[in-house]
Amino acid sequence: MTHRRILAGCIPLRWRELIVGLVAANCIGIGWGRAEPPAKPKPRTSAMVRDEDRNFRLYVKSWTELPKENVVLQQRDYSCGAAALATMIRYHWGDNVTELQLLLEVVKMLSEEELKERVKNGLSLTDLRRLAVRVGYEAAIGRLEFDKLRESKIPLVVGIVVNKFDHFVVYRGMDDEFVYLADPARGNVRTPIAEFKKQWQKNAVLVVVKPNGDLKKISPLLVSGEELFLGELNRRYLRDQTTTKFVPY
C-alpha cells in the first residue's frame, strides 16, 4: 500500500467533548472489493431459571455469537474500510447500512482513474471520510495522542498494521490492559495496549457523527461493563491455570 497525505477538517465545537487534541494527520490506505450484506443475526438462545418465589427467563449469548456481535464482517479481502465504516453507522448511529451499499457509493464517488488507483493501492482514510459525508454524516480526520484515546465517548475508525498488512478497525474502548476493537476480519477482539501502540498507524482517527445525533447515547458498539467483567474473569482463570502452586509439607 502507498502512503497518502491527508488533511484533517476543522473539528466542530460540539465534538470537543468527545475528542481532545485532534490535529492534521497522515494515514495509510486500505483496499476494497465486492461485498455482500452481512448475515442476519441468529436469535438468542434462552434458559429458564427457577426458584421457589418466581420464574424468570434469562437470555444467554453463546461463545460463538459474542465475537461477531455488533460487527459488520468484511466479505472480501480488501473491504475492511467499508465494513468498519458500516459497523460505525449501523451499530453506533443506528442506520441499517451494508458494506455493499457503501462500496457502491465509492464507485459513484470516484472517477474511473481514481478507482483503478484505489484497486491497486487501496482506499485511504480520506476516502472513508468523503464516503461518510456522502451518505449523510459529519466526519473529520485527525491525530490523537494515545492518552487521549481513552477519553473518546464514541467509537472511532482507526488504521492499524497487522502482519505487515494495512487494515481498518473500529476502536471501541480500553481498560488498563487491553484495547477493544471491532475488527471486520476477526470480529470483536482485544489487543494488549503495548501491541496496539505498535500497530496504530500514525495515531490517525476518523470521527463520524450523525447530524443532530445524541453524542452521549448508550451505544452497543462501546465496550460494556459485562465485557470488562468477562475479560477480568478470563485473566484470573489464565493466571490461576498458569501459576505454580506450592503446597507446604
PLM region spans:
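Short amphipathic alpha-helical segments with coiled-coil-like heptad repeat character
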Residues: 1-4, 88, 180
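Active-site-adjacent structural segments surrounding the nucleophilic cysteine of cysteine proteases
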Residues: 29-111, 232-235, 241-249
